[in-house]
Design a protein with these regions (language model features):
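Active-site neighborhoods of divalent-metal-dependent phosphate/nucleic-acid chemistry enzymes
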Residues: 2, 79-121
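Structured helix-beta-strand junction loops
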Residues: 38-39, 75, 132
Length: 138
């Protein structure tokens, strides 16, 4: 991966970064530190933010969820993509693919947003990203 490459950060990565007890925490932390050191252009989406906040609120505490939300604002250069109705409509095409069974609607919208922005890399621990043609970092 080149320096200053665009990278999409998925829910699983945010969760692993936020929760030190998460089995993927160390792997996520190492990937995150490498991305920051290489000046990666980081993106995520409103659906991913909402999904992550909800998970942290339910499986950790409200304070953890709020602290994570506040930490996003401190990340210089993080782009949070909105998800239009047109993008959601386009996302449904991924559900027709037989190789993407048990796909989440949030992941499908992520694929559309990544494709539209030309993002090839994802900090994600979900096999669907690779199946859909994106490259994992971390």
């Amino acid at each position: 991966m080149k320096s200053r490459e665009a990278v999409f950060v998925d829910t699983g990565a945010w969760i692993a970064l936020a929760l030190t007890r998460d089995p993927l925490h160390q792997r996520a932390r190492e990937a995150w530190d490498s991305l920051l050191a290489n000046g990666a252009r980081l993106s995520t989406s409103v659906p991913v933010v909402l999904e992550t906040f909800t998970f942290l609120d339910r499986h950790a505490t409200r304070d953890v969820a709020l602290a994570w939300k506040d930490s996003l604002g401190a990340l210089k250069g993080l782009r949070v993509e909105t998800c239009s109705l047109a993008a959601m409509q386009e996302a449904w095409q991924y559900f027709a693919r037989r190789d993407l069974h048990k796909l989440s609607a949030v992941d499908a919208t992520s694929f559309v947003l990544m494709t539209r922005r030309g993002i090839r890399y994802a900090l994600a621990f979900d096999h669907h990203f690779a199946t859909a043609g994106f490259r994992h970092v971390g």
